[in-house]
Design a protein with these regions (language model features):
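Conserved helicase/translocase motor-coupling segment
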Residues: 1-59
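C-terminal accessory regions
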Residues: 61-173
Length: 173
């Protein structure tokens, strides 16, 4: 099944980082039979987090670790391309059992699971909920707190960003 857990935030108990560790432990635990290196296990779902033009893999590409030894690992991406990473390139990868709503933009999944908890109060906004829900083609599973859901639905205020873009463009014209 094409399923993805999305979280509004990286931190907190229901954030990307903590949930990735929890799901790795539950779905693909470290065992004597399962090769492991630098916190990654053979079979882990991983995401490339920076562009690498020499390897032709880009920020947001998701794959699965298919081989590990003491100095390198191989990730198979969805287009059946195998990419080898040496130990000094491991920082270009992160677990992808869970990803942020922001990282999921532009992607679609059959099923999306979205934890909504009050600890994410700063990110509980209607537009973020809309983005997460519209990543799902068939099914959305909301897990958590009804109050957090109601907060997100009723909060249509987005943070105002001060980029100075207009001023910078005016200077160039």
């Amino acid at each position: 099944m094409d399923m993805q857990v999305l979280s509004p935030m990286r931190r907190e108990a229901c954030g990307v980082d903590a949930l990735n560790r929890t799901l790795q432990e539950a779905l693909n635990p470290e065992t004597e039979d399962n090769a492991s290196i630098a916190g990654f296990h053979s079979g882990d779902k991983v995401m490339q987090i920076r562009n690498d033009y020499t390897k032709n893999v880009f920020n947001g590409d998701v794959g699965r670790i298919v081989w590990i030894d003491t100095e390198k690992l191989i990730v198979q991406y969805t287009d059946d391309v195998d990419i080898t990473y040496t130990r000094d390139e491991f920082a270009s990868l992160t677990l992808a059992y869970v990803m942020s709503v922001h990282k999921s933009q532009g992607s679609e999944y059959s099923t999306v699971i979205l934890p909504l908890v009050r600890a994410h109060h700063i990110m509980l906004q209607r537009n973020l909920l809309y983005t997460a829900v519209t990543r799902a083609k068939k099914r959305v599973i909301l897990v958590g707190d009804r109050i957090a859901l109601f907060t997100a639905v009723s909060n249509d205020r987005t943070r105002r960003r001060y980029t100075l873009l207009a001023e910078r463009l005016a200077e160039r014209i």
